[in-house]
Regions:
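Extended, low-hydrophobicity, polar/charged segments
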Residues: 6-200
């Protein structure tokens, strides 16, 4: 067996440990055993007429865990970073391709905010009603005071579809990028800033 075949076999085995049901669902699941924050996402998507494909899986805390999800949904899951300035007075949600490296200096220069850092779990829960590992653009539906500024890497905007969690990291969604931009964001009263990140 070649080295490439071994790597593929190991990745498939890891995927099976995290994804027991490979069915892609397109309807709202029963609420039993699911958090209200997750069900609220499905309710809003239905209200806005936004279709999606849903994949249930074990908790996935990192973008590396999501490789199997990428393959099954035919998308690239977004890397979502919750950031703040040094004074912890301005907050950002950054959506970028999972394979890109995040360089603080590169982003800081573009948005005019020096010394960016990762915001705390407490702010994440307060503003987005999300816990670490489940950060998602869907969390903006909970940011009624517009405390969080959305930043989207231009490569994410170029894709027809994007992948995100519905505020929990046990489910992944495939959504049309245009639906998120033209339907979801206006409804939750959030704009966005396009950024150019090279990861270099």
């Amino acid at each position: 067996m070649s080295g490439v075949q071994i790597c593929r076999k190991e990745r498939y085995e890891e995927m099976n440990e995290l994804i027991h049901d490979t069915t892609l669902y397109e309807d709202i699941p029963p609420s039993e055993g699911r958090l209200p924050r997750e069900m609220a996402v499905y309710g809003l998507l239905k209200e806005l007429g936004i279709s999606y494909q849903r994949l249930d899986h074990e908790p996935m805390a990192t973008i590396e865990d999501c490789q199997g999800v990428d393959e099954l949904l035919g998308i690239h899951m977004c890397k979502n970073l919750f950031l703040c300035n040094s004074q912890k007075t301005v907050f950002y949600l950054l959506m970028m391709p999972g394979e890109k490296k995040f360089k603080t200096k590169e982003l800081s220069h573009q948005i005019g905010s020096a010394r960016l850092s990762f915001a705390s779990e407490e702010f994440m829960e307060e503003f987005l009603h999300i816990q670490p590992g489940a950060v998602s653009v869907m969390g903006l539906m909970n940011d009624g005071e517009n405390r969080v500024n959305l930043l989207i890497d231009e490569d994410v905007l170029k894709e027809e579809y994007l992948g995100c969690h519905p505020c929990v990291n046990t489910v992944s969604l495939r959504l049309k990028t245009e639906d998120v931009i033209r339907k979801f964001l206006p409804y939750v009263k959030h704009g966005y800033t396009s950024v150019h990140l090279t990861g270099e």
